[in-house]
């Protein structure tokens, strides 16, 4: 985009921004979705670029108005500039990408080689009768675009492995583990540690689930699976043995998305060297600390 176009976009944003009174009675400048779309077309730019420029000028995209009391416009801009990779677009990952898209994460990369089948319909947010047989990663990206065109989303319809992990993960501010087996999680953890990227782990089985955030210098999944985790038979995973009902992925994915938010904004208490464990059937929520172990 030329400097002249940038100047034009800034001028148009100031002109198109509306002053409204928010639900708390405060005056705020907002940019409505239709105006953002028209401006992106006029400037031959993306909706993402328009939102970023608007927030840099203190103009709140109308879709983020209800975020303002808990997330400042400066923090919302930081989210828009962030890049998050979600590995897996099934039970956990499908919910995670939708939540992060609504929150305004600027760049989402979705990695999943699988396709939807009927057994996914009970729990996976992106699974519908219409999506059966379709690529999970591609379906996720289409859903992200429908929810928030201000998010730049990229699908990878491949299985993450040692040959492609670094290329896919490089440059991310956070990576979400939405996998369903231990060997793949350990491979992912190894790659994120080498790249210096925080990893948000999530796992579930039955009505139980867990969340933990792993920074590069942390022992991480060794706390949970020991040193022999890579030899665990995928067919004997808790998910395979106990099944995964409807509610568990939605809750654990929400906790994972919140960990991503805390990492990017540098606020709140992250579950680092600690695991949050939830048993939805009993209503028990526990935290296990791994400090000094």
Regions found by a protein language model. Name each.
Residues 2-34, 155, 160-161, 166-167, ...:
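E1/E1-like adenylate-forming module used to activate ubiquitin-like modifiers
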Residues 2-84:
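N-terminal charged helix/coil linker that caps or initiates catalytic domains
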Residues 51-52, 111-148:
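Glycine-rich phosphate-binding loop and adjoining beta1-alpha1-beta2 segment
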Residues 77-115, 253:
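Glycine-rich adenosine-cofactor-binding loop
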Residues 96-97, 140, 188:
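Hydrophobic residues within alpha-helices
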Residues 142-162:
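S-adenosyl-L-methionine
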Residues 238-276:
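Conserved anion/nucleotide-ligand pocket segment
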